[in-house]
């Protein structure tokens, strides 16, 4: 659930991160496998694989799982036949939504994604309908209660980050997507543990909604993220100040 709110406001979606850890690992396995298939099994010479592995490590995915995913991608543990697709559309309140998927059955995935949009009061759009509103960025987030903003800022800028901002108790480090892996690795080596790390589609501007519409939009995003074929969901929703998702 990237590109629309800080970690502190999206814990309702993953927050339950432990309960959803298996599902999250499944998504990482797909991402690592397809990266290894396309560029080889060595993270040192395959930037996409290196990024995927770093993201998995940041989420505490076991090393054995990562190694098996790489071998699956290189064909050592069977063939990988995932297709990468991008769905674009609008959610409640006119929020722009991008859905990135890895699927072995695009008809199944298209039907599922369309159904979620429709039942949630949104609509799936044509290719290019909302993607122009976003830019791909590396986004690394830290809990401001756990790490020092000053220390993160110094280390991140030294590592080549584009921007560092703190809001609602979350320190957000933004990078060029090509620098994401090296910046994350540099911060990990200095002992900074992120709460989330991903190359995400970040919107140019955000759309403010009332609390009721925000709740509906976030519920739609939750449902999309729960689909096993969906890797990431990005939107331009701006969370109202003081908003809390009902349990």
Curated annotation (Swiss-Prot):
One GO CC annotation: cytosol
Q: Which InterPro entries match?
A: Integrase-like_N, TACO1_YebC-like_2nd/3rd_dom, TACO1_YebC_N, Transcrip_reg_TACO1-like, Transcrip_reg_TACO1-like_dom3, YebC-like
Q: Does the keyword Ribosomal protein apply?
A: no
**What intrachain disulfides are recorded?**
none
GO biological process terms, semicolon-separated:
regulation of DNA-templated transcription
Concerning PANTHER family, the annotation shows: TRANSCRIPTIONAL REGULATORY PROTEIN YEBC-RELATED, TRANSLATIONAL ACTIVATOR OF CYTOCHROME C OXIDASE 1
Localisation: Cytoplasm
Among the Pfam families in the record, one is Transcrip_reg
**What stretch or stretches form a coiled coil here?**
none
GO terms for MF: DNA binding
Q: Which family does it belong to?
A: Belongs to the TACO1 family.
Instruction: List UniProt keywords, sorted A-Z.
Output: Cytoplasm, DNA-binding, Transcription, Transcription regulation
Protein name stated in the entry:
Probable transcriptional regulatory protein TDE_1487
């Amino acid at each position: 659930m990237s590109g629309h709110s800080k970690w502190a406001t999206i814990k309702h979606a993953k927050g339950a991160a432990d309960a959803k850890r298996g599902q999250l690992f499944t998504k990482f396995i797909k991402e690592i496998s397809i990266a290894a298939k396309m560029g080889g099994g060595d993270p040192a010479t395959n930037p996409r694989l290196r990024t995927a592995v770093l993201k998995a490590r940041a989420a505490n995915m076991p090393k054995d799982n990562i190694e098996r995913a790489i071998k699956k991608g290189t064909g050592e543990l069977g063939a990988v036949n995932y297709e990468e697709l991008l769905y674009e559309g609008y959610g409640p309140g006119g929020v722009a939504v991008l859905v990135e998927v890895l699927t072995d059955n695009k008809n199944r995935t298209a039907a599922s994604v369309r159904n979620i949009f429709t039942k949630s009061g949104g609509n799936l759009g044509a290719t290019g309908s909302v993607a122009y509103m976003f830019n791909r960025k590396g986004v690394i987030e830290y809990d401001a209660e756990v790490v020092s903003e000053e220390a993160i800022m110094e280390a991140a800028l030294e590592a080549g980050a584009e921007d560092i901002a703190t809001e609602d108790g979350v320190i957000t480090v933004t990078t060029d997507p090509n620098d994401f892996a090296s910046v994350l690795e540099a911060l990990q080596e200095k002992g900074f543990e992120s709460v989330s790390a991903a190359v995400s589609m970040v919107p140019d501007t955000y759309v403010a909604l009332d609390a009721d519409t925000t709740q509906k939009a976030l519920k739609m995003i939750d449902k999309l993220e729960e689909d096993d074929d969906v890797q990431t969901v990005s939107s331009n929703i701006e969370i109202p100040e003081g908003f809390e998702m009902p349990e």
